[in-house]
Regions:
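Small cysteine-rich, disulfide-bonded extracellular modules of the LU/uPAR three-finger superfamily
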Residues: 1-105, 112-150
Length: 150
């Protein structure tokens, strides 16, 4: 299973027009039962295929914590998550499953004020059983996503 990340054009536009900031905005991570990336999405919504509020997951997900950008002289610019959500290690987003647990095939990062950032397709179903954890470990080397110019 390969993980594929798609960045929403609305977020790129927001960064270029200074309406959004990877390091300053409050960013959440939500889990989905289907990968639903659409280039035309301009607003994050909890409707559709987001994992339901139950068994240790809450609709809307949770804040991912601290984010960084590599040095402006580095190519590509690496956008990383270095904080933690859910009591996990730095650079992770974690939920503790209860009851029957839950399953997700994708995660979406979004600015809490409404702009979707990216869709992370896990390449298949990932399940956390009751008492287990569902952990996303963000790539500490290459970042969640990057931007490069030539």
């Amino acid at each position: 299973m390969s993980v594929v990340t798609h960045i929403y054009p609305a977020y790129i536009n927001g960064v270029l027009t200074k309406a959004n900031s990877w390091t300053a905005d409050t960013v959440n991570c939500a889990l989905f039962s289907a990968s639903t990336f659409t280039n035309t999405d301009t607003t994050y919504t909890t409707s559709g295929t987001e994992v339901a509020s139950a068994n240790g997951y809450t609709t809307g997900g949770g804040a991912v914590g601290t984010r960084t950008i590599s040095s402006q002289t580095t190519t590509p610019q690496l956008c990383k998550i270095t904080g933690a959500f859910g009591g996990g290690a730095a650079g992770t987003t974690t939920w503790t499953a209860t009851g029957a647990g839950f399953t997700a095939v994708a995660a979406k990062l979004y600015v809490v004020s409404g702009v979707p950032i990216c869709n992370v397709d896990f390449g298949g179903s990932q399940t956390a059983s009751g008492g287990g954890t569902f952990t996303i470990t963000w790539d500490a080397t290459n970042g969640v996503f990057n931007a490069a110019s030539s």
